[in-house]
């Protein structure tokens, strides 16, 4: 009987304690809420402004050189008025603002997003142009990797192909020429490295790439002279003579031709083109820089 009475007396005590544990925090929270009832919660909520107002504020900031503020305004249009005409315009202008700031990765990302959503709009070639410019601005000298030059080339070629009448085509072609020149310069840099170490086969491969793939760049003259030098060192005199002949035909006043001619003359040889050589065939495509 004693144990039974004890067991019965603990249950009500536990119920009272549980009730108190629920009531006390509630009273505390109510007190806190009543003491802070004047807090302005509106500052935690986006202040929605008309899309055209935000967009024009973005343009004004952009024209004034306040690029961070411009980006914020264009982003606000996209966030507060998604899928509206103003949001579409803000997306491409936001990409341009990022480009102006030098935030090239962000500019590329925004412009690519624009093209994915609006590939057929009037601003689509402009978005493509921004992507190309963002890659172009990151091109490094020829001693370093030329990934950005390849990306510039591809992006600008796509622009010229897809929008041939666009106002951006002329500048895109200039960027294409520059990117090609960079890529040719990289091949020459590697080719010279191999030539200095008398690794002639590897050197020829690089110089051949320049002649065949970058025939309209300023590096073709030197590439033909280096081919003359490499083939001559390998004992392939017919190829050496052909390289010199093609060089002389296209660049008769070139110092590189004079050096190649002198090299052949040192062994009683002269430039003579072999029509069956790959060099002769590639030479017909040379247009000069």
Swiss-Prot record:
The family note in this entry says: Belongs to the BamD family.
Q: What's the main place this protein lives? A: membrane
Question: What cellular component terms from Gene Ontology apply here?
Answer: Bam protein complex
| Lipid-acceptor residues (N-palmitoyl cysteine) | 32
Topology in the lipid bilayer: Lipid-anchor
Q: Where in the cell is it found?
A: Cell outer membrane
User: Which positions carry the signal peptide feature in this UniProt record?
Assistant: 1-31
Give the lipid-moiety residues, type S-diacylglycerol cysteine.
Answer: 32
Indicate yes or no for the key word Membrane: yes
What is the name of the protein in this document?
Answer: Outer membrane protein assembly factor BamD
TPR repeat segments run 51-84, 87-121, 184-217
Q: Name one Pfam family in it.
A: YfiO
Assembly and binders: Part of the Bam complex.
Stated role: Part of the outer membrane protein assembly complex, which is involved in assembly and insertion of beta-barrel proteins into the outer membrane.
One Gene Ontology BP term is: protein insertion into membrane
Entry's InterPro entries?
BamD, BamD-like, TPR-like_helical_dom_sf
What is the name of the gene encoding this protein?
bamD
Gene3D superfamilies in the record:
Tetratricopeptide repeat domain (1.25.40.10)
Q: Alphabetically list the UniProt keywords.
A: Cell outer membrane, Lipoprotein, Membrane, Palmitate, Repeat, Signal, TPR repeat
- Residues in a coiled coil are none
Organism this protein belongs to: Mesorhizobium japonicum (strain LMG 29417 / CECT 9101 / MAFF 303099)
Organism classification, top ranks?
Bacteria, Pseudomonadati, Pseudomonadota, Alphaproteobacteria, Hyphomicrobiales
